């Protein structure tokens, strides 16, 4: 089941505000979706995710197929029961992970033959297998199996002919994914994925073919795969707003806070990215006034929280009152610097909570600006504040 309703639009851009109703709940859009690769958002309890405003999270079809396997998933009635998350879940198709195996896999028209990275077993992923796995996972949003078109391979930039061949295979796999999804009687929603590399004419062909197939929602894939930022932004400016206005649009694997706000302006409703969680574990924190490197020596004696305007548990403690509003319940930069230096596990747990809170709160502010008809002013203020630096 999927119902998408647009509540407001921005007159100066393609931005829109909506609600997405799925089998496990209603999602307010635009939305950022935390990534839970192995059935968990690394280091974060489900309760904490709910408290910080997460409405929908991702699961990784490929990795959950490898471990713990479909028998275990089936015994729990799907991924929701297994990871104790009662809100919507989106699962990717497994295509990107199989593509990432490089020399360990062989792609044919039928599907992908590859060696398991867990135990070396010979395995096969096809559009039909992907649909069967995702049906067992019972995710609210299922993604078609696609071939992720690389930007370059061993220093060789993908040509238009190579990108076309890849895009056309993804298009044929979309047909097979949809047929199998319907044969299985899956009650959830299947999204098609627009491919075509960095070639706008191929993106347009892919888009038109998928729209003809009438998917409940659409994703833009094959971006943030090693291409220069300006080329990624070029595709972002071209493709999302050309998708059907009455259906949700999902930009896969993107990106920085600036990318998210720009994506909203280009008509994107849904985002996911490992950046907030991965960067948190590597000591890079997102704040209203730019990125903060907690490993820098200057933070050794700094009494401030990561972001004085932030109300996350790391910055504001259990009271949830920011430093700017008089609260003093959070942890100092000095303490988080110390935890990182010592390799204490609490460090990345707190920084992950902060980064996810920042992303989710950013999307909340975007929604509020759209509700108020002030997205243009918000966008300008956001850019100025982020450029100021911490």
Swiss-Prot record:
GO terms for biological process, alphabetical: queuosine biosynthetic process; tRNA wobble guanine modification; tRNA-guanine transglycosylation
Residues in coiled coil: none
Transmembrane segments: none
MF term (GO), any: metal ion binding
Region (RNA binding): 253-259, 277-281
Cofactors (names): Zn(2+)
Active site residues according to the UniProt entry: 92 (proton acceptor), 272 (nucleophile)
Enzyme Commission number(s) of this protein: 2.4.2.29
Keyword ATP-binding attributed: no
Residues bound to Zn(2+): 310, 312, 315, 354
Family to which this protein belongs: Belongs to the queuine tRNA-ribosyltransferase family.
Protein name, UniProt field: Queuine tRNA-ribosyltransferase
Organism lineage string: Bacteria, Pseudomonadati, Pseudomonadota, Betaproteobacteria, Burkholderiales
